[in-house]
Design a protein with these regions (language model features):
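Acidic, glycine-enriched catalytic cores built around paired aspartates
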Residues: 102-166
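Active-site capping/gating regions of soluble enzymes
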Residues: 1-98, 102-107
C-alpha cells in the first residue's frame, strides 16, 4: 500500500493532462483554497492530495483529490493504477504521513499550466511505456489544440476592462 502511495506521489505531476484536462481545471487547482496543490498523503486529511479515509482493512482505499469532475473517470482510474503500479514495481518508499493541514503547501513538481504539464507528460519514459507513446501524443495534441483555441478568444472581461485602459 505504501509503495502504491509513493507511486501516486511521484507520478501524479507527470499525469496532470489526465487529472487537469483543461484551463478551468488549472484555475480550480490554483485559484481555490479547498483543492490540494501537493503530493502529500494522510489518513483522514482532506488537505492532502492522497487521502486514506479509513484505516479499517475492509474500508481501506486511497482518494486522489486532485482530479475534478471535468475529467474522464476511466483515464483517471488508469492513471492512478499506473502510478501505483510503478510505485510497487520500483519499490519506492512514500514520504511520512502528513497529519497537519497541507492546504498552504504547494509542491514545486506540480506543473503550473497546460504547456508545462504537457511537456512533463510527453517526456516521462515510464508513463510513455505504460500508456503507449501514440496515446500520449494524441492526448497532448488535443490539449494543445484546445488551449490554442482558448487563447484565440477575447473574453468579455478583456473587452470591458482592458479596453478602458487604452
Amino acid at each position: 500500500m505504501k509503495n502504491y502511495i509513493r507511486g501516486l506521489q511521484k507520478y501524479t505531476p507527470y499525469l496532470m493532462p489526465i487529472y487537469l484536462p483543461n484551463i478551468n481545471s488549472f484555475r480550480r487547482l490554483f485559484a481555490t483554497w479547498g483543492t490540494p496543490k501537493n503530493t502529500k498523503w494522510g489518513v483522514g486529511n482532506r488537505s492532502c492530495a492522497f487521502r486514506i479515509p479509513s484505516v479499517e482493512e475492509k474500508n481501506m482505499r486511497i482518494e486522489n483529490r486532485i482530479p475534478g469532475s471535468d475529467t474522464n473517470p476511466y483515464l483517471v482510474f488508469a492513471a492512478n493504477l499506473a502510478s501505483g503500479y510503478l510505485g510497487i514495481k520500483n519499490n519506492i518508499k512514500p514520504s511520512l504521513e502528513t497529519k497537519n493541514s497541507a492546504f498552504e503547501d504547494v509542491d514545486p513538481s506540480i506543473p503550473k499550466n497546460i504547456d508545462e504539464s504537457l511537456s512533463m507528460f510527453e517526456n516521462n519514459e515510464e508513463i510513455n511505456e505504460i500508456f503507449n507513446e501514440k496515446f500520449i501524443r494524441s492526448i497532448a495534441a488535443v490539449r494543445r489544440m484546445e488551449y490554442q483555441a482558448y487563447l484565440s478568444v477575447i473574453s468579455s472581461w478583456e473587452r470591458e476592462v482592458l479596453l478602458l485602459n487604452v
